[in-house]
UniProtKB/Swiss-Prot annotation:
Domain II as annotated region, ranges: 88-127
Region of interest (Domain IV, binds dsDNA), ranges: 346-465
Coiled coil (residue ranges): none
Signal peptide: none
Entry text on domains: Domain I is involved in oligomerization and binding regulators, domain II is flexibile and of varying length in different bacteria, domain III forms the AAA+ region, while domain IV binds dsDNA.
Gene name, Swiss-Prot/TrEMBL: dnaA
Stated name of the protein: Chromosomal replication initiator protein DnaA
Native source species: Acinetobacter baumannii (strain AYE)
Quaternary structure and interacting proteins, as annotated: Oligomerizes as a right-handed, spiral filament on DNA at oriC.
Keywords tagged on the record: ATP-binding, Cytoplasm, DNA replication, DNA-binding, Lipid-binding, Nucleotide-binding
Length: 465
């Protein structure tokens, strides 16, 4: 039967939990080239439409060899079905607010925790805070220092209105999850009986839906609203999850009313989350929003050295510098590069040196050679400041050319693997000491001059995009 074949493929494509909870209970029939799937209620049909109908349609057409060209998902109102028409709620929203979704027949599932939770040591629930995500293992630099200091301050003033909620934002892989979980780990260490819950937006949705299906909505609400600290990762991914957004809105308000601390992360500043309910976005701005930026080269070096030290790996500083020059996007990629270097070193039975590093990162080096070069940096900087390229690399020392030139040299040192002499040659044959001085000047100017620092960040984004 076509649906049986589809189920076999869907089991391979989807997680066991999603397959058992959402796909297996569906009833199917094929009518004149249409595969009709029946779900117990409107909420179920909407979930399938939004998340899995496209995949099911592709599989149905492939496995039927073109016989089936359309897949429909309907509420099962047939006589004797799981949910007869007389039992259907008037609207999806009403169903969500007034009644749990009935448990489909023939589906047997093991009990699950209501949420991804870290609570006191006396709790039987699984502790999902990463024990490695502590303040002592977090490497601070200019790009994340304010966020780290704010998180420490939250611990001393838990629930204080000036930083509740605390909203950490920035691109993926920069340590936002590490910082928020560091707060949770530190709180549990100081107060073992504190109630701390960490979850992603996805797990919040899954756990909320699961509670609806099992008739345990009140238990879910109680767990979420009786906390001392709620940590939610990637809050922007709640977009489009209407019922879950409503529940999160009430949970958010309940915790704030009790002065319980909330920490959220997102890839964007709160007011840029235009796809979320404006009321919720407004509440995100009630406390304190702190950005986390890509680490500069000094911070990247320290991250590598600390990671190596904690792993018992001997990483020479010149090798850390080389890796940091090649991998600039985020901390996650940086750690991935180090893991690859360590793996190659162990495979060859050789200590880590520049030859091992170059061999390990040859794919990265090949890509960067095609994308970021000193010449490319010079072109982008000259266009950004609207100055002729010949003046950028020329001998004139007037401020209008000197500052962009220093900035370009600093970027070249950070983004390419070129040495000081090589960079100097690309800038009109200047010697290595001139380039070294320019790079040192860039570091000090970024600390002293906010406009210069902003120009540096803008160019960094342009070159990395």
């Amino acid at each position: 039967m076509l649906w049986t074949d589809c189920l076999t493929r869907l089991r391979q494509e989807l997680s066991d939990n999603v397959f058992a909870m959402w796909i297996r209970p569906l009833v199917a029939e094929e009518v004149e080239g249409i595969l009709r799937l029946y779900a117990p209620n409107p909420y179920w049909t909407r979930y399938i439409q939004e998340n899995h109908l496209e995949l099911i349609s592709i599989l149905a057409e492939q496995l039927s060899e073109g016989r089936v060209r359309q897949v429909e998902i309907l509420v099962d109102s047939r006589p004797g079905s799981i949910l007869s028409s007389s039992e259907q709620p008037a609207t999806t929203t009403a169903a969500l607010q007034t009644a749990p979704i009935p448990q489909p027949a023939k589906v047997k599932r093991e009990p699950e925790p209501v949420a991804n939770t870290a609570v006191s040591s006396k709790s039987s629930k699984k502790k999902l805070l990463n024990p490695q995500f502590t303040f002592s293992l977090f490497v601070e630099g200019r790009s994340n220092q304010m966020a780290a200091e704010t998180c420490r301050k939250v611990l001393t003033q838990l629930g204080a209105s000036q930083h509740n909620p605390l909203f950490l934002y920035g691109p993926t892989g920069l340590g936002k999850t590490h910082l928020m979980q560091a707060v949770g780990n530190a709180l549990l260490q100081a107060k073992p009986n504190a109630r701390v819950m960490y979850m992603t937006s996805e797990s919040f949705v899954q756990d909320f839906v699961s509670s609806l299906q099992k008739g345990k909505v009140e238990e879910f609400k109680k767990n979420c609203r009786s906390l001392d600290l709620l940590l939610v990762d990637d809050i922007h991914l709640l977009a489009g999850k209407e019922a879950s957004l409503v529940e999160f809105f009430y949970t958010f308000n309940a915790l704030l009313d009790e002065s319980k601390q909330i920490i959220l992360t997102s890839d964007r500043y709160p007011k840029e989350l235009t796809e979320l309910d404006p009321r919720l976005v407004s509440r995100f701005s009630w406390g304190l929003s702190v950005g986390v930026e890509p680490p500069d080269i000094e911070t990247r070096i320290e991250i590598l050295l600390k990671k190596a030290e904690n792993s018992g790996v001997d990483l020479p500083r010149n090798c850390a510098l080389f890796i940091a020059q090649q991998v600039v996007a985020n901390v996650r990629e940086l750690e991935g590069a180090l893991n690859k270097v360590v793996a190659i070193s162990r495979f060859k039975g050789a200590p880590i040196d520049l030859d091992v590093v170059r061999e390990s990162l040859k794919d990265v080096l090949a890509i960067r050679a095609r994308t970021i070069s000193v010449e490319n940096i010079q072109r982008v900087v000259s266009e950004y400041f609207r100055i002729p390229l010949k003046e950028l690399v020329g001998p004139k020392r007037t401020r209008i050319y000197a500052r962009p030139r220093q900035l370009a040299m600093g970027l070249a040192r950070e983004l390419t693997g070129d040495s000081f002499p090589e960079i100097g040659m690309a800038f009109g044959g200047r010697d290595h000491s001139t380039v070294m001085h320019a790079c040192e000047k860039v570091v000090s100017l970024r600390e002293e001059d906010p406009i210069f620092d902003e120009d540096y960040k803008n160019l960094l984004r342009l070159l990395q995009s």
